[in-house]
A protein has these predicted regions:
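Carbohydrate-associated surface elements
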Residues: 7, 149, 170
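A short helix/loop element that forms part of the nucleotide-sugar donor recognition site in Leloir-type
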Residues: 19-24, 177-193, 348
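Membrane-proximal helix-turn-helix segments that form the acceptor-binding/catalytic region
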Residues: 65, 71, 83-86, 90-95, ...
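Acidic anion/phosphate-binding donor-loop and adjacent secondary structure
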Residues: 155, 161, 171-189, 211
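Conserved donor-binding/catalytic core segment of Leloir-type glycosyltransferases
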Residues: 194-210, 216-219
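Nucleotide-sugar-dependent
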Residues: 210, 257-295, 301-316
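Nucleotide-activated donor-binding/catalytic signature segment of Leloir-type glycosyltransferases, i.e.
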Residues: 226-233, 238-265
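A charged, aromatic-enriched C-terminal amphipathic alpha-helix characteristic of glycosyltransferases
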Residues: 327-328, 332, 341-371
Length: 373
């Protein structure tokens, strides 16, 4: 297996230590990995994000074309970013490989839903982006994506149903099964979180599509309750949120950097209530990957999603799996938090769902069978 990717930079929007944003790097191991240079903005705006994605599409094109001699059987491209699909399709044509375009986020739909394309769906930017997306989706052998509603969206965009594959985000279920209380207590002490207060946890990217301003509002309304809002992660919107919390004097809200891979099970078990927040219009274009591990740990999540979306349907189909509330409503978010805090700390519905449907080995085995045809 060969992988062409970028140096690690997300969600901090900063290239990791021992990596470079300006040089190629080849790594040998179970797979041969080429790390391609790219532009990484410190504060990503719409224009800077496009330059960021475009820079990777250009830098990755050359090592991608070098794989022609290797003659791959399958080429799997991951979206974001759509900018790389022309190169993927060209390599497939030259090598005779079959192609799979895997959709983590519908970039264009998310951009339109969050109003980042100027004049909306009728504007020239939106029309150009939609045409580019259509070309990518219609000229690969298979399209895979992470939810049933996103599969339906691919079909609505003109992909033949028989060419759409379900490839959900997985969880390493065993990691979240037996988490020692001592590990949770140690992490809690390390972060300086008091034992006598319940933890409202948000862990993940801090960007535009989450709408975390409402979490600030919720913390303000709950400032007299024995709660701590712990915001863990990085992203372009973090500094602004920290400033908002400081201006309001929110002593019940604390911000922390992204925690290590090894600390994740203890971090998630520590949360009495988990926040899975998105703006209206993003819920079917993107499916939060953080939810899989929250379910695996048996956490009680408050999800902001409309009833007809994938997340809304999940909560309706599996009663008790999470608390689903109206997006962009502070009142609904506060009510959802209060409801979640009344539930038993361990959510058996969530854990059992994760065991049945999200186990990493099962998900990968099925995907391999699907792309083999």
């Amino acid at each position: 297996m060969r992988v062409i990717t970028a140096p690690p930079y997300y969600p901090q929007w900063q290239v990791g230590e021992n990596y470079s944003a300006w040089r190629y790097k080849r790594e040998e191991g179970a797979a041969t990995v080429w790390r391609c240079p790219l532009y990484v903005p410190k504060q990503p705006s719409t224009l800077k994000r496009l330059l960021h994605l475009g820079s990777f599409a250009v830098s990755s094109f050359f090592p991608l074309m070098a794989q022609r001699r290797w003659k791959p059987d399958r080429i799997i491209g991951v979206v974001p970013t759509l900018f790389c699909t022309p190169g993927m399709r060209l390599l497939a044509k030259l090598s005779g490989a079959r192609t799979v375009l895997h959709i983590q986020d519908y970039e264009v739909d998310a951009m339109l839903g969050l109003g980042l394309a100027g004049k909306g769906k009728g504007g020239k930017v939106a029309q150009l982006a939609t045409a580019f997306e259509r070309s990518g989706l219609h000229n690969v052998d298979n399209v895979s994506t992470i939810s049933r509603s996103m599969m339906n969206k691919a079909i609505e965009k003109g992909v033949a149903a028989e060419n759409v594959i379900f490839f959900p985000n997985w969880s390493e279920i065993a990691r979240f099964q037996h988490i020692a209380d001592a590990d949770v207590d140690a992490l809690r002490n390390q972060l300086g979180l008091p034992d006598n207060k319940k933890i409202i946890l948000y862990s993940g990217n801090i960007g535009e599509k989450q709408g975390l301003e409402n979490v600030i509002e919720a913390a303000d309304r709950l400032r007299d309750e024995p709660l701590i809002f712990a915001i863990v992660g990085q992203g372009g919107g973090k500094a602004r949120l920290e400033k908002m919390a400081q201006q309001r004097g929110l002593r019940n809200m604390q911000f922390f950097p992204l925690q290590s891979y090894d600390a994740l099970p203890a971090l998630l078990k520590m949360g009495d209530c988990h926040l899975v927040v998105q703006k209206r219009g993003a819920a079917d274009a993107v499916l939060p990957s953080k939810l899989t591990n929250i379910l695996a740990v048996g956490g009680n999540a408050v999800i902001t999603a409309e009833a007809h979306t994938e997340l809304g349907q999940l909560c309706e189909t599996f009663p008790g799996i999470a608390v689903c509330v109206e997006p962009e409503s502070v009142e609904a978010l506060v009510a959802g938090i209060r409801q979640a805090l009344l539930l038993p700390k361990h959510n058996t519905v969530a854990r059992e769902y994760a065991e049945r449907t999200l186990d990493k080995e099962n998900v990968l085995r099925q995907f391999i069978n699907d792309i083999r045809g």
